Amino acid sequence: MNTTILRKSVLGIAGLAVAGGIAAGPLHLTDTPTVDTRPVAVVQADKPAVDKAKLIPHGVQGEQSRIDLNDEQTGNVKAIIAATKKAGMDERAAVVSIATSLQESKLENLGHLGDRNDHDSQGLFQQRPSSGWGTVEQITDPEYATLAFLKGLKQVDGWQDMPLTRAAQTVQVSAYPDHYAQWEQQAADLVAEHWNS
């Protein structure tokens, strides 16, 4: 074998190795790598807060009641809020609607309860087909029932400036007109929680 070719090959390979080492840098670091442990600010786009003064403009009246809600009841809260928005009404209308439904059905979409039922009242608002609220299918549809209630509420002059129980009673014509007031705080809390969700 030609020694000149062998020498050129060895020198070429050595040259490549040196050049590669310079270009690639050292393969072994003598310093331990560090991790930046400084706190990082996380910015979350929060939903706009609901104006609490708008929810209960007159303050709550009387002792307040509260119940724990299951998933179905929470779904009905969200349906009432969605229908309120669809009707072009504000958070206060949602508070009145939810408090009314809390009193009438505990936010349960009730069917006919037989002997325990108040006449033919059904749905979230215990509306009656015989009183012109709609068919059984309509009044047991949360969106329809809420829109029907809100249609009645819109017809009450100055409802926004009334105590909740008076506004609800004017629409519902209940035998227990003062019972709506006990649900105002929970209704306001639910609207504050779900209005922007």
Language model features with spans:
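N-terminal export and membrane-targeting signals
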Residues: 1-17
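Hydrophobic alpha-helical membrane-insertion segments, chiefly the h-region
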Residues: 19-27
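N-terminal low-complexity, Pro/Thr-rich disordered segments
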Residues: 26-69, 197
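Peptidoglycan-targeting cell-wall enzymes and recognition modules
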Residues: 55, 59-67, 105-163
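Export/targeting segments at the very N-terminus of extracytoplasmic proteins
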Residues: 56-102, 106, 194
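Surface-exposed patches in mature extracellular/periplasmic domains of secreted proteins
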Residues: 87-98, 109-114, 158-168
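Soluble periplasmic/extracytoplasmic beta-strand elements of cell-envelope proteins
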Residues: 97-99, 124-128, 170-172
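Catalytic and binding regions of secreted/periplasmic enzymes and modules that target cell-wall glycans
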Residues: 139, 144-197
